[in-house]
Amino acid sequence: LKEMIQSWRHVFKLDPDKEIDDETLDAVCLSGTDAIMVGGSTGVTYENTVNLLSRVRRYELPCVQEVSDLEAVVPGFDLYMVPMVLNTQDPTWIMGRHREGIERYGYMIPWDLVVTEGYIVLNENAAVAKLTGAETSIEASAAAAYAQIADKLMNLPIVYLEYSGVYGDMETVRTVRRSLDNARLFYGGGITSAQQASEAAAIADTIVVGNVVYDHLEQALETVKAVKD
């Protein structure tokens, strides 16, 4: 199952804390995207995650949970993606929460379904940056160094560049991509058009499209075509 991420080019990220009607969800799940990622920085609960999972499960496509809160981990996802924030001085988000989770729930964890993401958060105004105390104003060379720590020292399968809500600096994305040998580069942040999707996907291995689903559905659907064509 972990191998399936290697073929993903486009992923829609849905937030359990946001309303999405059946018609919109239908369009998203039948769009041709490679997977649905369920997760958010705030307001994620067990109940709203179960609700969203049960609705996505009607469709034939992989559904993964990005784990942000231990209390909201729900059985039944194809994979569990666990972020490890690399560019923070607060060890809580590198290892602290992870230790707590394993100590409490270790016996229940389906390790064969767990994938760790080396997160590099680069938008200072994003909720995830404020929550984790991420050092967002780093140079591209520093971001690339963090990426190499994830790739070469920690052997993480995914490096995730998170611009969360703003379209990122593609030169930084390119610098990070060049620094990687084995890890897959996920890019997320501010993709609202086919052109941006195409540009980001030409550099990153996988693009993650989120907020635009709730704001401009047609534009969101066009991002799939832009990547797939």
Regions found by a protein language model. Give the residues of each.
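N-terminal active-site wall of soluble small-molecule enzyme domains
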Residues: T42-V56, V64-F77, G168-S179
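Catalytic cores of alpha/beta
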Residues: Q65, D69-V82, V176-V209
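Hydrophobic faces of well-ordered beta-strands that scaffold small-molecule active sites
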Residues: W8-L14, I36-V38, C63-Q65, Y80-V82, ...
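Glycine-rich phosphate-binding active-site loops on the catalytic face of alpha/beta enzymes
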Residues: V38-G43, L79-I94, Y163, G189-I191, ...
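C-terminal helical cap(s) of enzyme catalytic domains, especially alpha/beta-barrels
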Residues: V50-V56, M95-H98, Y105, V212-D229
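Conserved N-terminal beta1-alpha1 strand-loop-helix module at the mouth
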Residues: L1-L61, E135-I158
